[in-house]
Each structure stands twice: as C-alpha cells, then as structure tokens.
Amino acid sequence: LLLVGPSGGGKTALLNMFTGSELSEPISKFTKNTLLSGDMNLPSNSGLLFQMNDKLIIIKDLAPILEMGKEHRGEILSDLRDAYDGLVSKSWGTGRNTRWEGKFGLIGAATNAIDRHWKVFSELGERFLRVNLKTDSKAQTAFAIEQVGSEEEEVKASLRRVGSEFLDHYKEAVSTTHPFVPDYLKSTISELGILVARLRTPVQRDRSKHVGTPPQPEVGTRLTKQLIKLATAAAVLYESPSVTKYGEYRLALRAALDCIPTN
C-alpha cells in the first residue's frame, strides 16, 4: 500500500505510530542486497526477508529507491514483486543459492513527486494499491505536534504505544473475525478492478511521443482480490459483520480511483 501526500501532511507521523511494535519492521535504507544477500561470509538467512515474515513492513520514504540507478532499482522491485507472491529464489556468482517463502504486509510513503516515476511501478505489476492522503489545516496541526513542543518525545512514545496496541489487538481479531462480502459487492468490486487495471496500464512512448509497443493491461484479478481484502479489513476495523456498500466499499473505491495515474 502506497500512501501519497504533500510534505508535512502527516505521512511520517502516521507510520511512526507503528514502528514500536514487534509486529512491524521499519526500513530506512534499501540496497539491492537488503532483502537477500549473496555474501558467503554471512549466514544464509541474513537477509531482511527472513525477519519480515508475518510483519508489517514500513518504508517511510520511497524517494531513495526511486532515485536509484535503473539496475539497482529494478533488482529491488523484482525482489519485492517475488516476495509479494510468497517466494523468492536467488543465485549469486559467489555460489550461494537462497530461497525464501512467507508473507508480509507493506506500507510505503511518498510525496506527489512519485507521479514522475509512475511508470517505474509498472515493474511491480499489479501488486500495489495507492491512497492519496487528504489533509486539512486541522490535521496538519495535529500531526505537527510531533515536530514541536516540549513534550515531543512523550507524544511520540504515546503514539507508538497506541500503534503497538492497535496491531496487537487486530492481529487476534483477524484470526477470529470473517466479515461477509455480499455477492453483488464482489461483482461490483470485480468490475471496478478490471476497469482500474486498464486505466492504470502504462503506455510506452518514444522521444517523439509515438506509442511503441501496444499496451498490455493487467487482467485485474489480483487487483480485485486486493480491493476485496481492503474492504474486508475495514469491516474488521469497524467491527462490522459484513462489507457494506456505503461503508467499507467506499474505502475500496477510493483506493481504486487513487491508483489511476493523472499524467
């Protein structure tokens, strides 16, 4: 899930809430060897992927990844793509072969400058959702308390404690709560997924702006599953027995519309 919003809009403050939990794994720096390493001097399970199972991965700023050289950036995105699918298998010239299987959640944050790199995310295929944060002056003032004031550290610690309790509580809730998704909403979300998959298909153009290879849109199956999971998760959060048209579905609709590039 990508959270996109202006600088000072509360993205970092929001994500910082969850960094104190044992169920989260914040990552501040990425290299092509961060997730898995081919260094024979390190244990075979030394890569970060082996610490990420069943955790929420938090990347507070995606800009450094986007600004990397194409080769390194491509390798990182390739590893993330495979990791999303639950299996990463890599071989290095050092003779090491590494295999990882598992699952995790990931939330990353970026400013609207990410739109300049939107085609980069086509390398992740259909494996992401995007939410554009809506902030007003009141929200910005509330989050600004993290930056100023004599009680800054106390406030940060309090927010991290709340975030940790939140993750602990809902880890148990998701294993015992299974909100019902009506068939008509499954059908609606499926049609929405197919539409958005087409609308966010990258179009490759040459220097003269002529279309090169005809664009190949996603099938939309994975996107539909993600939107249904998002709506279902919202139902768990709201303690609702089922996904409703005017509640949880609207969150899925918002995320779907935010996935459509504007440039």
Language-model segments: what does each one mean?
Residues L1-Q140:
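Conserved ASCE/P-loop NTPase catalytic core
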Residues L2-L14, P241-L257:
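Short alpha-helical "patches" and their helix-cap loops
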Residues P6, P26, P43, P64, ...:
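Proline-rich intrinsically disordered, low-complexity coils
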Residues I27, I57-I59, I65, I76, ...:
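Weak global preference for isoleucine
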Residues R99-G102, W118-L253:
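Phosphate-sensing "switch" segment of ASCE/P-loop ATPases
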Residues L257-N263:
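Short amphipathic alpha-helical interface segments
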